[in-house]
Amino acid sequence: MIRIELLSKDNFHPDSLDHYQRKQEVKKVYRKQGGEYILVDCAYTEDWDAGKRHSVAQTISGDDRITYLALDEDRVVGFISLLKQLEGPYMIIDMMQVSAECRGLGIGRRLFRRGKEEARKAGAEALYISACSSEETVAFYKAMGSKLTDFPIKRIADDEPYDLQMVCYLEG
């Protein structure tokens, strides 16, 4: 049974992501052409080496974040990391991942719901997502109620020019 817990010193340490499987085989991505996003062929593999996993572990356990873990026993199989500091009306999802072997099990939906709960508690109007442009990633965020924003946060959009800038407004 996968459980969702707030990251703490009791359930997370620097090597907690050592066996995490970021791997994603991407076939199609969204690209802006003529003012519209269209799907184009662009095959590549997204993955993390040991150094990247350690860097991510350090980042998501920072004091400036609220991070929830999806745990299978004591093994991290997913996480959502939100920036505590609101940016205007938005709480920013800095990272959200589900390990390759656990995708399609509803873990991402559960993590995203926790993100919405935290945003609501913080007084945000919406979650802000700089989404990887892969077909599957964008489909997930759309299924969760997110849409492209007309008002991207410039520094985030500039930092990730191929990402789609999305928001998910919180229901009353």
Question: At which residue positions do the language-model features occur?
Answer:
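Conserved catalytic-core motifs of GNAT/GCN5-like acyltransferases
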Residues: 128, 132, 147-164
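Short, Lys/Arg-enriched, disordered terminal segments
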Residues: 1-3, 171-172
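Conserved GNAT acetyl-CoA-binding A-motif
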Residues: 119-131
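Helix-turn-helix
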Residues: 137
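Conserved acetyl-CoA-binding loop-helix of GNAT-fold acetyltransferases
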Residues: 98, 104-117, 142-143
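Structural motif
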Residues: 122, 143-144
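Acetyl-CoA-dependent GNAT
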Residues: 8-13, 19-90, 94, 99, ...
